[in-house]
Amino acid sequence: MFSYILFDLDGTLSDPKQGICGSVQYALKSFGIDEPDLDRLEPFIGPPLRDSFMRYYDFTPEQAEAAVAKYRERFSVTGKYENTLYPGITVLLHDLEQAGAKLAVASSKPTVYVEDILVHFGIRQYFDIVVGSELDGTRDRKEEVVLEALRQLAQRYGAKPWEVVMVGDRSFDIEGAKAAGTHNIAVAYGYAQPGELEQAGAEIIVRDVQGLRQVLLGGAGHFARQGAGQNGRQDGWQTAGQNVWQNAGQNERQNGWQNARQPGRGAGQEPPVGSSRRYRSSTWQSTGQGSAAGTWQNAGQGS
C-alpha cells in the first residue's frame, strides 16, 4: 500500500457538475451567452477556469478574468455545495487512514473552496494536507499543486516523490503527477473524455470506487508492469482485476481497454459519442485494435 496518497477533488472524490456548470452558465449569461445544456459545460470541470473560458468561448484574457469573477459570485455562495460525494468515498478514506496512509488533497480549485467542501461533507479530518490554487490565479497548474503537496509531505514526513501516488480523473492530473515524479491512478468515473486517460499515459485506470479501493488497499504491486501482448493481446493494457486496467508499457495506445467480466457481450455496438457524462456513468469499453474508438461493448451497466 502506498504511504502517501494525493487526491484530486472534482470528479474524483465528489461529483461537482451542478455547482460548477451552473456557475459557468451564470457567468456566460453576463456576457449575453445563453447555454441551457449543462452537459455542454462539463469540459470546465477540472482545468483552470480562465483557460476554459478562453478555449471554449474565445474569451480574451481580460474577458476570462471577468468571467471567473462572475463565476465566483455564484459558486462561493451556493455552487460549492451543489456537489455530492461518490458512493464509497467516505468509507475508503476512513479505511486508508486506519491502514496508516497519509492523505492529501491536490486540486486546481482555490484552497478556500476545497476546505469548505471537505468540511461540508465531513471528510476534512482524513486529510493531513490540503493544497489548491490561490484566488489571485496563481498555483492553478496541476503540476504546481502536486509539487506543493509533495513539498509539504516531504517537510512533514520525509516523503519522496516515488512513494506518492496521485489519484485523479483528468489528463491534467496524470500529467501533473508525471511531471512531479509521482505514480498516478486515473479514475474513469469522473469527467475525462473517451481516450483522454489512455493518451495521458495513466499507469492504472479504475472504473469505479471499488476498483480504486482494490488498488489503494491492495498494494503498490499493481504498478509492477506486465509484458504487453500476453494472451494474444496487441495492446498495452492488462486486466489487473474486475474494475482495474493496468498499463503494461504502451501508454500511447488509445484502444487498450479490455473487459474483465464479459468479453463477448455487445461486441460491435457503437459507444456514446461526445458525452463525458455518458462515458462516466456507463461501462462502455473499447476492445478494438483499430482506431481510437475501437470496438466498443457494454459490460452490463447502462448509462
Model-identified regions with their sequence ranges:
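A short, structured active-site edge motif that brings together acidic residues
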Residues: 124-139, 163
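Helix-loop "lid/cap" segments that line or gate small-molecule binding pockets
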Residues: 27-28, 48-61, 117, 145, ...
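Active-site neighborhood of HAD-like aspartate-dependent phosphohydrolases
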Residues: 1-43, 57
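Long, intrinsically disordered low-complexity tandem-repeat segments
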Residues: 224-269, 283-291, 295-301
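Substrate-recognition element of Asp-dependent hydrolases with the DxDx(T/V) motif
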Residues: 24, 92-119, 127, 131
